[in-house]
Structures are given as C-alpha cells and as structure tokens.
C-alpha cells in the first residue's frame, strides 16, 4: 500500500470518528427519528394495555368469537388499521392463556412495525417468534394469506408448532410447508390462514406454480396439477437481513438435465492441475476471480491438445479451465463445501448449513466434482428462474425482523423500499464487549483462544490489584480469605480479599464462533489435547443442532459453532428443558401439536428438576453468563453482531471478544498491510497481541468496504435480473390470466389481430417490393444492394443496375481475397492453395494451386475479375421481376391470408383502399368469422373422434353413443338411422346443430354481464359480492341462475368473496363451459404448452446471452445495457413466435392428433375427465415433447407423468332394464342410457 493510500485511510478514520461524535451529540440533544417513532407507537401500546382487563374477563369461547367479529367488521368496510389495537389486545390475551407468554409493550411495538410493512431490529432473545404472532393474527383476519418466512425447515416447523395453540384457539388455521412435501400437503398448508416456511420453499413454490397447468381450486383438473400458493399477500420474514441481503445474491432455479458431454470437466481438471500459479494464471481473492495469462493460454492449449481456444469447436475451453482453476484455488473443502456420500454439498457461507440439492451454476459445480474425484452430475437447463429479491418484491406487503438490520438500512430502502425501526429492549443490556485481540499469526491466535477457553472453563481466576492473574481451583473461601490451589501446584495459597480485584469462577459456559468447518475442527483438536470436553456444531452435525444449542448455556458447557447467523435458537442460561423434552418425544409424536399438554408439562418439569436447570441458570448468571469468542471477523459486520448477540439475552449478563490474526482472510485481503505496518512499528513479536481502537476501526472500515462491494454485486444482479423480471412477469401474468379464467378466445383473437396488423404493415409498406428485390438480387449476385436505389425502376433497369453494382463489388472482393492469401509485402507467406480454393468456391472456377502460381499476380487478379464479371452476367434475375410490380405486396398479403387462415381474398378488393387500418379491420373481421366457423366445427370433431373406434384398418362408429351425445351436447333429437351417413355428410349436419347451440352463447354472455352489473351497481372495484349485494338477495339469485341455466356448481357462498372482476370471469367461464367447453379446453392447452415451451427455450437463450455479453466490454460497450437491449429484442421475437405458432395450430385443427382431440372432449352430463391427460396430449399436438419434463416437475414431488381420473358419483335410485329411460328419449333404459351408464 502506498504512503498516500495509508494517509487517506488514516484521514478517513479520523474524520469518520469525528463525524460520528458530532452525530451522536446532535441525537442526544434533539432525539433520533427512531426514538420519536417508537414513542408514538408506545401510545398505541398503552391503549392496548388498557383493554387488557376487558378481554381477560372473557371466556375462551368469547375470546375466540372476537375473530369472527373482526372479520365481520372488515367485510363491512373497516380496515386492518381500524381494528389493530383491539386485535393485538386479543392476541396478547391469547398468548397468556394458550402459550403462557404475555407480549411485552416492546413486543407490541415490534408487531406494529411489522404490520406497517417495515423491518423491526430486535436484539437477540427479545422474543421475535412471539412478536410475529401479532401482525400474523391481524393480517390473517382478511383471509388473504400470511406467510411467515424463516431460514430453515426446522425453524419453520418449530415456530409453527410453538405458536399454533395461540392461532388455533383464536379460530385461525396454521401449517408449515417443508421441502419434500407432496403437492396435496402443500395445497392444504397454503389453504390455511397462516403458513410458515423457508424463503427457498416459498420461492420455488412460486416458480413451480407458474409451471402448473391449472389454477388453485380448479376442480376440472386433478389436484396434483393445480397451483398451491395463491396470491402473495403479506410476508413476515425472520432473520430478514440473512434472507433479503445475504441470500439475495443466489437466484432460484428449477432446471432439468441438459444434453452435454461430462468428460470435458475431467479433461479441464487435468489441464488446470498442471498450470502454475502466477506464471500461467493469477488469483484475485478480493474479486473472487482467476485469470489466465497469455503464457497460461498457450500452455493450456498445448495441454488440451488444441491449436487455439479461439477457433470454432474449442471456444468452451477457456470457460472450463477458468472454472477448474476456481475450483482448486477459490473453493475449499470443508469451507465452501463438503463431500458427503460421494457428492459435493454446498455449505451456506452465512449460516454454515449444508444446502442439499443446491448446485453452483455455469459448470462450476461440475468443476468442483471433477476436482474431488466424485461422480459428475449432469449439467442442467433452466426451466424457471427468479431471484429472491424480485420474488419478495411481489408481495403486496412485506415486513421483517432481525437482531441486525441498521447496518443495512440503506440497502433495505433502495432495493425493497423498507424502513428499519430499532425496537428498544425489554430489560437493559448487560453484555460486556471486550476489545479485539490481534496476533501476527493464525497459530498464535488459536493458541490464545484455547488458553482463554481453558481459563474460563477449567480454572478459577483470582485477579489481584497489581493486575496479576492466578489460575487454579478455589478450595475454600471466607469473608476475608480465599484459599486457592494454583494450576500445576500441590500447595494451596491464601489471598486476602483486600488484595483481590475480582474472582472469575470456573465453569462459565463458552460459545466459540468460527467461519468454517475446517476452523471449527482445528480448534476442536486443540481443546481435545487440553482435555476440555466440548460440542461442535457445524454442517456435519446438523442433525444434533437442537440438542447442542439447548446445552450451550449450562455450567461448564463449551460449544464450537460455525456461523450462528440464522440458527434461530436461543441459548438459555442453565439449559433449555423444552428442547430436550421434544428431542425425546419427536420419535413418539409427528409434531409438537400432537403431544398432550399434561405429558408435555410433566416431562419438561421432570427434565428441569433432574438436570437442575433453573438452579444452574442462577449460578451461571452469578458467574458472568455466556462468554462468546469469535475466531475472526466476518466480512459482514452483521454476522459479528449476531454472534455477540448470542449472549446477554433478556437482560442476562454476558461477554464477548474477538481474536484476530494478520493471516485471517479479511485482514489479509483488506487490512493486512496497514495493520502489519502498525504492529511492526510497535515492535510486536510472535505470540504477542495488541488491543487498539484504531485497528478495530480499520477493521470495521474494511468490513464496510466489503459490504459495499457485496451490495454492488447484489445491485448488479438485480439490474441484470430486472430484464428477466419484466419478461417473467409478462409471461407469468399472461399464463395466470389463462388459468384464472380470462377468455382464451379473446386471448387468441388478440394474437390473430396482432399477426394481421404486423403482416399488413409489412406487406403494404410502399418499399416492401424494392426491399424484397434488393435482398433477392443481392443474394443471387453475392453482394449488398441498397433498396432505395431501385425505387421507380422497371425490371430491365433494375437488372442492369444490380449487375453493374455487383461487378464493382466483385472487383473489391477479388482484391481483398488476393491480399489476404497473397499479401503483396510478405511473399514468403503466400498461400496458393487457399487462393485456389477461394476462387473455385466463389467464382465457379476449377484452378489447381500450381496453375495460379504460374501467373503474374496482377494478371491473375484481372483474370479472376473477368471470371467474376462473367458469372454475374450469366446470373438470371427474372424470378425477381414480379417483386417490382405495384401490387406485389397486396398479392403476398392475400396469399398469406389464404395459407394462414384459409381465407380467400384478392388484390382487387384492397387496391383502391389507401388507409391500411381499413384493410386491417376487414381482414380481422374475416379472420374472426373464420374462427367462429372453427368454433362450431371443433365440438363435432371431438364427438366423432370420441365415438369412432379404429382397429387397424377397420373403423367403426358407435352410433348410439353419438346420438346420445348429440342430444346432451346440442339438445337435438337424432335417430340412429340419421347417422348412417358418410363421415363428411354427418360432419356437415352436426356442425349445423353446433352453430345453433353456439348462437345462444352471445345472449347468455350478455345476460350474465347484466346480472353482474345489477349486483355491483356503482360499488368500487375491490368490493366483494356479498358486501355489494347486502340483503337484496341478488347474489343468491345469481347463484341459482348459474346452477339452473348453466349447470354451474358455485354456491352463493363461493361467489360472495369475489369482487367485480373475479365474478365476471367466473360467470363468463360458466357460459363458456356450457356452450364451448371443448374449444376452450383446446385453446387453453395449446396456449399453455406453446407459452411454456417458448419461455423455457428463451431462458436457455438468455443464459447463453448472459455468459457471452461480458465480451461486449472489449468493444467499449456497457455489458448491462447490451444485455437489456438484446434481451428485450429476443423476448419480443419469442412473443411474436408464440403468436405465429398458436395461430398456425388453431386454424389447422383438422390435422390434430386423434388422441389430443379426444382428450378435449367433454361429457355433456358431467364435463369431467382426465384433464392431466389433456395436457399431455396437447403437447403432442403442438409437437413439444421437450416440455414434458418441465410439466412433470411442476406436478410435484411424485413426478407423475399422467394424472388420475376424477370419479364423479351421483347417488340415484336404481333403474330397471326395461323401464322407460329417465332421459326422456322414449326408449327402454337398456336400449338407451344403460349402455352409456355402463
């Protein structure tokens, strides 16, 4: 580091501390904004407390009924803010009765902060889990869903089971989602008022839902293919900094196997092992990057056995070798990952947990697997992806809580628009934070840590007034004298209390926080050699986490833990009897909710008494509480604060200290030179330590620098993901609209209109003909031609001009080819063979290289130009003559309409129409009419296909079944004799019946719209049907009409919760289900499968774009800007292709696969069949077999390729064989519906 840099750092430290003091002085005089906000919330807390006697006097049933009353008030127009104080008072009373815990005032304040959609910073041990019940209960009253989000499955389940008695006794439902749950289990959990789960599980469920073929609750489809999650309404995030900041860098990806060669990873690993650091590549730990030098590239090319990495077929090598080098030099075993069961499992750098199922992307995971010699997993192709940042930003309201948020307040606001409010503690903080100790080497540091653990754990320490410390065991103590047996001595010594400053008792519990598995195991070995019994908590002992943590506060406990971030378990002084009780009962009961209260209380009391935990807790408090040691500073200050926060909870005593060395990663990379020069000036030697506030501030500055860098990384990720986020939202919104019942007909007609408008704009452009001719002529002549030059030319003029331009261009092309292969100034590099090959390929000659060698260079150029001119002159451009005719664009448009939609038009119809919009309107009208014809034809196709049986060459028609179906579907009487027509005549006849039935749908749609409008009147858009209807009876009348006229199953209660838009969709869907069920099902399947397939392919394209866009930087372009521009171009191209593919299929329904047509058939009596099979067959019809894996993944953990048929049972009296058929046909039952009923 230069002198100027050191001086700048020192100035920054000095001025920074000065400004901090000035800010603190101003705050002490005027008060902080945070304090004023808390004071305002305290007023609400006082009012809640005043209500306590009122609710305390209620019976359990009366208290439970408050939930019903609150919901009634909300339906009548009150808001959550209006009922907040009363709801909090009810929740507080519920906590007292059903949990044995009363919410403190500061917890009420925390609940208000969370309800407002902000982040509450609460010190560890202040009861965040209980705080979450307040806003969760309040917001669950709306019945729109509340998600409580934690960092792992264990905490999600534990917190749900712990708080469930409160929710359930207040009349709410609650459950937790867990990884590995079946689809039906998750649907049940999401159906609850409050759902607990992990950030990843909520995120992945969002992505899975957007791959499913049916909306939540759509009973036309099997439950396993329906969506689970529902709208994202309100989320409460525990450890919000860990989830929204640390985890935000990791995108969530659902992927499937890609067809790639795995052997290349082993080859790249072999090459990487032979390259030498510094000579062949450099490692930048600060930027987490490895870069090959020029010498390294040449060495790697030689080792890989290729001529150049930058020629076709070899361009993947640099990326493979970069990944292999990163695997060896940046990703370390037992730090970044572990090897478990011959698999590489990632270790979360912030929590120390194993992340089973996670993979590094872009081939890095495979590179690490090759390094470790374990089986290499297949690389994957993305089916769905999103960052946690963008998923959580979609919640209508978001809140969170953590012990450490203020350091990241700026980022929370900039990214999520979330304020941070620091909540005061219930009791004063008694934690003593000792200054850092800094050592020269890591070896010295670990020895000092082991000494400190031994001192605290094994020995009583007498501290004298002169600063001397004597370690030993106190044998006796009186008011005046202490008898101590010093360490290693056989004789006791006596010390007068007058000479003693302090006595530190042995057995104080110690928690040591490390940054990696490797460091925790190294320290464990040191303690074992000293005979100190201890527990190690890291990713390898994940299963014993609860047992270990529950004992960490007991007398004499020594616990080594990798990062405590996200652990979520309080360390209670003396031990936690409830954790031990559950560890005994978890094998007997599936959840804590199943444990009888009496058995639970008896076991907890028995453990507490047996283990003497309550008494131990008092002793531990007397000897100083939990002592926390940090083995090094984390790059994030929050992680250090979380480690410190493990002690001193709820006003308990405690202490913490960090031990550092110059060899620590943070010190070495960011602060090493500065601190090392200071220690050298102070004359420090190995084994010695310094305590310096200046060094501590320098370390804090280094941490802040890293945090700023990480923020920039996250911000960059967000900027890249913004492109995909907008595209994802557009695709998912389109898809969701389809699932939610938006008219698939209207969506298809929009695609048709867009296509027609696009083609009209293209074909009727005045320059379309000359543009086409210039492209055609340029391709034939092998040169670039400017379309503008051909305006107002006839064919002869255009032919002459084009060839003249081509001859001029050929002269330049020949000269360039000669200069490239036979450079005039470097005759020794002439390549006659390449020159001959070029001439033969481009000019149609038949030269051998020796023939050209015998020619003079200039003579050869003239001869090649002559060949080029001759070739151009002989080129026939007559095919392009029609392109220059005035009505060429109109003729192409008419041909396109005929080919695309089967609609006949002539240029004469539009030749005199100057306004292109009128052409578009007329073509749209004709396309809609053609589509209406298809709409009438398709049900007939499904019916004939359904009742036609093909056995080899034999084709038979079930006439009786068809007659029965025609009667039910079109309400038309038809005899068996009438269907003894040939298939084409029968089809024509049935289409007429279909048209008659379909014509009634328009009137029914109008009638439905009128009824909805009458029900809602002038009500606001968000008002529900029940509130709009009131006591008028209109809602019940609408439900009756839907049931009697359309056979719809929705009850008045089902409709009551819908607003105007939702009810409109429901009634229009009911009309379509009555009159066009087959067509709507077909449209839906075609749209879903083409959208899903196109999106999946687009994601792969965007993956490739993102990996290559960095090269734009070499061309002085901003890669992010280019990524956004090119990404949007690709997306619009994808969207256009969706329209083309869908409309191509819809207007060619006659050529659909028979299996697909049958899958969209709907029984006129029940309208239920195997919808999942319909989805599969639609894929066949659209020729999108590649999407099957994605759909299967979306169907849930069962991975079923086909769904089971819903059985519809109707209990009716048994009908005799010879009795009249109840359908009214006049036939006997055995000759009519008995066949159909089986």
From Swiss-Prot:
Gene source species: Rhodopirellula baltica (strain DSM 10527 / NCIMB 13988 / SH1)
Similarity remark: Belongs to the SecA family.
Binding site for Zn(2+): 1221, 1223, 1232-1233
Cofactor(s) listed in the protein's UniProt record: Zn(2+)
Compositionally biased residues, Basic and acidic residues: 1199-1215
Annotated protein name in UniProt: Protein translocase subunit SecA 1
Cellular component GO terms, alphabetical: cell envelope Sec protein transport complex; cytoplasm; plasma membrane
HAMAP family: SecA
Annotated GO biological process: intracellular protein transmembrane transport; protein import; protein targeting; protein transport by the Sec complex
């Amino acid at each position: 580091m230069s002198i100027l840099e050191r001086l700048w750092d020192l100035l920054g430290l000095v001025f920074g501390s000065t400004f901090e003091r000035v800010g603190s002085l101003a705050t002490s005089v005027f008060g902080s904004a945070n304090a004023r906000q808390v004071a305002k919330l305290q007023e609400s807390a006082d009012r809640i407390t005043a209500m306590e006697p009122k609710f305390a006097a209620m019976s359990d049933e009366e208290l439970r009924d408050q939930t019903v009353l609150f919901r009634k008030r909300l339906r009548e127009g009150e808001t959550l803010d209006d009922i907040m104080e009363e709801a909090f008072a009810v929740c507080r009373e519920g906590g007292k009765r059903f949990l044995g815990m009363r919410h403190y005032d500061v917890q009420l304040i925390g609940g208000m902060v969370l309800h407002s959609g902000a982040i509450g910073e609460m010190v560890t041990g202040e009861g965040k889990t209980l705080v979450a019940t307040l806003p969760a209960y309040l917001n669950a009253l709306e019945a729109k869903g509340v998600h409580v989000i934690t960092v792992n499955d264990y905490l999600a389940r534990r917190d749900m089971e712990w708080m469930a008695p409160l929710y359930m006794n207040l009349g709410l439902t609650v459950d937790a989602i867990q990884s590995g749950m079946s689809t039906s289990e998750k649907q049940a959990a999401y159906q609850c008022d409050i759902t607990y789960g992990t950030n990843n599980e909520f995120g992945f469920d969002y992505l899975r839902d957007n791959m499913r073929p049916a909306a939540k609750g759509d009973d036309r489809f099997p439950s396993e293919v329906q969506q689970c999650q529902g709208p994202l309404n309100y989320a409460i995030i525990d450890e919000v900094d860990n989830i929204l900041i640390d985890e935000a860098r990791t995108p969530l990806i659902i992927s499937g196997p890609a067809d790639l060669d795995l052997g290349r990873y082993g080859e790249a690993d072999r090459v990487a092992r032979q390259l030498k650091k510094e000579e062949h590549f450099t490692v930048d730990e600060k930027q987490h990057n490895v870069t090959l030098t020029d010498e390294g590239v040449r060495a790697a090319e030689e080792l890989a056995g290729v001529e150049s990495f930058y020629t076709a077929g070899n361009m993947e090598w640099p990326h493979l070798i970069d990944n292999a080098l990163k695997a060896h030099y940046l990703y370390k075993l037992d730090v970044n990952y572990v090897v478990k069961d011959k698999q590489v499992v990632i270790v979360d750098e912030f929590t120390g947990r194993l992340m089973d199922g996670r993979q590094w992307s872009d081939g890095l995971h495979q590179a690490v697997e090759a390094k470790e010699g374990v089986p290499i997993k297949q690389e994957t192709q993305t089916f769905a992806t999103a960052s946690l940042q963008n998923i959580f930003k979609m919640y209508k309201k978001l809140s969170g809580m953590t012990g450490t948020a203020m350091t990241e307040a700026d980022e929370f606001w900039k990214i999520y628009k979330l304020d941070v409010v620091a909540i005061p503690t219930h009791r004063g903080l008694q934690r003593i934070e000792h200054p850092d100790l800094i050592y020269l080497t890591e070896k010295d540091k670990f020895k000092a840590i082991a000494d400190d653990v031994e001192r605290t754990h094994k020995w009583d320490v007498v501290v004298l007034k002169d600063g001397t410390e004597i370690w030993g065991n106190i044998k006796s103590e009186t008011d005046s004298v202490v008898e101590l047996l010093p360490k290693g001595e056989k004789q006791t010594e006596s010390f007068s209390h007058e000479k003693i400053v302090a006595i530190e008792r042995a057995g104080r519990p110690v928690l040591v926080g490390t940054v990696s598995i490797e460091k925790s195991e190294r320290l464990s070995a040191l303690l074992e050699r000293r005979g100190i019994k201890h527990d190690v908590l890291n990713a390898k002992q994940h299963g014993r986490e609860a047992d270990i943590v529950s004992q960490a506060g007991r007398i004499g406990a020594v616990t080594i833990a990798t990062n405590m971030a996200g652990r979520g378990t309080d360390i209670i002084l003396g031990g936690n009897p409830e954790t031990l009780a559950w560890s005994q009962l978890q094998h007997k009961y599936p959840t804590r909710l199943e444990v009888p209260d009496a058995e639970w209380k008896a076991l907890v009391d028995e453990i507490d008494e047996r283990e003497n935990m309550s008494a131990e807790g008092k002793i531990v408090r007397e000897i100083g509480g939990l002592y926390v040691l940090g083995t090094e500073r984390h790059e994030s200050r929050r992680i250090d604060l979380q480690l410190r926060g493990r002690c001193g909870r709820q006003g308990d005593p405690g202490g913490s200290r960090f031990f550092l060395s110059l060899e620590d990663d943070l010190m070495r990379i960011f602060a090493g030179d500065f601190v090392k020069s200071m220690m050298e000036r102070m004359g420090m030697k190995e084994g010695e330590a310094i305590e310096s506030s200046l060094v501590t501030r320098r370390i804090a500055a280094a941490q802040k620098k890293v945090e700023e860098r990480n923020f920039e990384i996250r911000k960059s990720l967000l900027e890249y993901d913004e492109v995909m986020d907008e595209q994802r939202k557009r695709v998912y919104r389109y898809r969701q609209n389809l699932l939610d019942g938006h008219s698939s007909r209207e969506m298809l007609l929009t695609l048709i209109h867009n296509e027609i408008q696009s083609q009209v704009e293209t074909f009727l452009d005045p320059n379309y003909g000359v543009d086409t001719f210039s492209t055609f002529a340029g391709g034939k002549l092998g040169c670039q031609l400017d379309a503008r030059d051909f305006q107002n030319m006839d064919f002869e003029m255009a032919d002459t001009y084009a060839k003249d331009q081509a001859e001029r261009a050929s002269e330049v092309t020949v000269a360039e080819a000669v200069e490239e292969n036979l450079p005039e100034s470097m005759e020794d590099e002439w390549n006659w063979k390449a020159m001959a090959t070029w001439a033969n390929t481009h000019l149609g000659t038949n030269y051998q290289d020796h023939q050209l060698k015998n020619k003079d260079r200039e003579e050869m150029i003239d001869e090649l130009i002559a060949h080029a001119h001759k070739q151009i002159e002989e080129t026939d451009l007559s095919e392009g003559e029609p392109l220059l005719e005035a009505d060429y664009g109109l003729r192409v448009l008419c041909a396109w309409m005929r080919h695309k939609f089967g609609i006949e038009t002539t240029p004469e119809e539009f030749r005199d129409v100057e306004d292109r919009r009128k052409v578009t309107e007329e073509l749209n009208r004709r396309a809609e009419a053609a589509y209406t014809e298809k709409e009438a034809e398709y049900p007939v196709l499904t019916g004939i296909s359904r009742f036609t049986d093909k056995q080899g060459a034999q084709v038979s028609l079930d006439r009786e079944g068809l007659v029965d179906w025609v009667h039910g579907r079109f309400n038309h009487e038809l005899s068996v004799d009438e269907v003894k027509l040939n298939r084409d005549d029968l089809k024509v006849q049935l289409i007429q019946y279909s048209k008659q039935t379909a014509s009634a749908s328009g009137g029914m749609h109008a009638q439905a719209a009128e009824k909805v409008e009458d029900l809602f009147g002038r009500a606001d858009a968000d008002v529900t049907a029940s509130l709009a209807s009131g006591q008028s009876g209109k809602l019940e009348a609408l439900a009756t009409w839907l049931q009697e006229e359309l056979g719809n199953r929705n009850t008045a209660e089902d409709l009551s919760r819908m607003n105007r838009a939702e009810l409109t969709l429901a009634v229009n869907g009911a009309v379509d289900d009555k009159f066009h069920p087959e067509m709507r099902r077909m449209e839906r399947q075609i749209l879903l499968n083409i959208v899903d397939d196109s999106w999946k392919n687009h994601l792969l394209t965007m993956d490739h774009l993102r990996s290559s866009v960095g090269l734009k930087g070499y061309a002085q372009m901003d890669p992010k800007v280019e990524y956004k521009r090119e990404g949007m171009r690709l997306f619009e191209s994808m969207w256009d292709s969706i329209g083309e593919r869908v409309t191509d299929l819809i207007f060619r329904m006659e050529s659909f696969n028979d299996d697909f047509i049958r899958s969209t058939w709907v029984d006129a009596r029940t309208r239920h069949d195997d919808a999942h099979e319909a989805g599969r067959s639609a894929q066949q019809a659209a020729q999108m077999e590649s999407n099957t894996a994605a759909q299967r993944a979306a169907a849930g953990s069962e991975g079923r390729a086909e769904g089971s048929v819903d059985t519809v049972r109707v209990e009716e009296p048994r009908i005799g064989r010879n009795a009249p058929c109840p359908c009214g046909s006049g036939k006997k039952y055995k000759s009519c519906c008995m066949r159909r009923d089986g």
